[in-house]
């Protein structure tokens, strides 16, 4: 199971401004997930365009007519039998990217997608069967997952940058320049 969700169009780094909602329905014991605007579209998730079957989705938690801020939910996005998107889920491919094309990045919109209550990640905060919200001991814990994932991307990209720099330095150390004057056989080596 490949679980990744990274960005949304409206956010940048302002996680509290997240537009995606997860509204708890105590009658059915389900959360209803929505991306109510175009800017709430989940954007750039790795593996989402063609391969991922599940995603960790961050959404504003609503229960008992009150918003409790961003929380994580596990969402199945594709059928495990024929790999088609599930009802209410619109998936797309964001196309070519500069420097990170090997990752299958996509987009996702949600329209009244219902998931069971137990698909909310409830290690630090909880929603009881009747919809009562139990807050985490430390409210900053909710932001740890997003911060960790962003740090991992920086670490991965720094490895790519180090490899590219090594190739560039090695190539420039042995590269021959063109003739300074036609017919002159003197070559200059470029060294950094």
Report the location of each language-model feature.
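Short Pro/Gly-enriched beta-strand edge/turn motifs at strand-loop
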Residues: 2-6, 88-92
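Sensory/regulatory domains in signal-transduction proteins
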Residues: 6-14, 39-41
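Short Gly/Pro-enriched turn/cap motifs at secondary-structure boundaries
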Residues: 10-13, 97-101
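Generic recognition of stable, solvent-exposed alpha-helical segments in well-folded globular domains
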Residues: 17, 52, 56, 68, ...
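Generic, well-ordered alpha-helical scaffold segments in large soluble proteins
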Residues: 21, 60, 76, 109, ...
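A short core secondary-structure module
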Residues: 26, 30-90
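A glycine-rich, basic-preceded beta-loop-alpha segment at the flavin cofactor/substrate interface
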Residues: 45-47, 83, 92, 109-149, ...
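Non-transmembrane, amphipathic alpha-helical segments
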Residues: 102, 146-153
């Amino acid at each position: 199971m490949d679980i990744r969700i990274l960005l949304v169009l409206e956010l940048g780094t302002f996680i509290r401004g997240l537009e995606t909602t997860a509204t708890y329905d105590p009658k059915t014991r389900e959360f209803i997930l929505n991306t109510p605007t175009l800017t709430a579209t989940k954007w750039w998730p790795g593996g989402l365009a063609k391969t991922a079957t599940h995603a960790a989705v961050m959404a504003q938690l609503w229960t008992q007519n009150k918003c409790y801020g961003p929380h994580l939910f596990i969402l199945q996005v594709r059928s495990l039998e024929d790999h088609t998107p599930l009802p209410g889920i619109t998936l797309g491919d964001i196309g070519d990217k500069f420097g990170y094309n090997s990752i299958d990045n996509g987009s996702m919109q949600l329209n009244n997608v219902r998931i069971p209550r137990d698909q909310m990640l409830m290690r630090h905060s909880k929603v009881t069967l009747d919809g009562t919200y139990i807050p985490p001991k430390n409210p900053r814990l909710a932001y740890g997952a997003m911060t960790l994932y962003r740090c991992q991307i920086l670490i991965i990209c720094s490895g790519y940058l180090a490899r590219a720099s090594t190739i560039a330095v090695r190539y420039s150390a042995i590269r021959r320049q063109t003739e300074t004057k036609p017919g002159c056989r003197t070559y200059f080596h470029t060294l950094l």
